[in-house]
């Protein structure tokens, strides 16, 4: 049923690559299969791009910079992005169904991602002609000013968990600054990424401004990173691969934006509004089956309200339902058998812990689907591996703390620094703790701020470096030139 539903919503080829505004067969003539994680069935084939394909894509982008794409004004680029946003919005329902089946994400979450994609292109379309340089007071007879210019050709390596969201925030910002892009989506889930090629043509983007080359990371991704004509790399994925990306990029001395892992805490003080906090505490941990870099996998709670919190969270946890993605329940499957195995192996480390609550499976789930029950563990020591390492699954641990100082110490005890949340009504405490937390984002009495296309996003430590989203991302996708004119 899902295969027919998928095909009914596809309006572009999935088994080709997109270079210079055209769909074509990859030079390797090889294909990779895409599975539906809800039932393990093969739902599509994609191209297995090789070095020749990557070279053609980069050359196409380079040529576009020298003619049709590079000749556009900032406002003209902005109008193209606005048109792309409109086309995405017109296809929200199609894209949501495709993403839900491809990634295994509940339909309502996939629809939110499609709407976010449209908003990213809208935001960066509006920002395209708002980038300004500065004039700098200097010596007599000098006029000094700065210019913001594109890097040139940017490479974008996109993960499987949020293809649309991450395309929106990296491709959108890069195009707004005038870069030409080569996109290498994940081989595990890339069907909505391929839609961007078709939509770009419909919007009127010049040939070569956007190129899409799916394939294996160790082959297509590696070739893209090593290509001598790539001027900037944006990578979202694991810490392990992020280190390799940065190492290879360093050989060509090109800048890299890394958005990697997380072990993000929510800190619940004794004066917190628990009724308001509860949906955030749970949803931030189980959204997309916990396969989110900014997932809140650690819940730090004051010992004064520990018993009350676990009672309330446990009751809600037991109501969570795992089902096929298209059935639109609380959780769908994880992406693959490999990811399920990783999560299962971590759960084997929990034998010394108390599982205080878990969700339930929907009846008659397909046997070949990659399903994992959400689990909540109580009274966990902050040094435990389940409290230190990124699991990338629906597993949350509750860690009690003594006081504010103890909470800060525990929150900062991992290698990561992506997101944190503070729940307290004490304004002075809000400011103190927000300043003390080692994290790229801190939310106060909320978590995620509703997605926040406008809000800069990025990490510290093992969570990576550089910033995506918001106006700040435009600076990362540009270089600064200083011009000093002497008037004699």
Regions found by a protein language model. Give the residues of each.
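Hydrophobic face of amphipathic alpha-helices that form TPR/SEL1-like repeat modules
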Residues: 1-38
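A short acidic/small-residue loop/turn micro-motif
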Residues: 25-27, 31-32, 47-52, 272
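Residue-level signal for inorganic ion chemistry
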Residues: 40, 77, 99, 121, ...
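Glycine-rich loop-to-alpha-helix module at the N-terminal edge of alpha/beta enzyme cores
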Residues: 41-131
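ALDH superfamily catalytic-core signature
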Residues: 240-381, 444
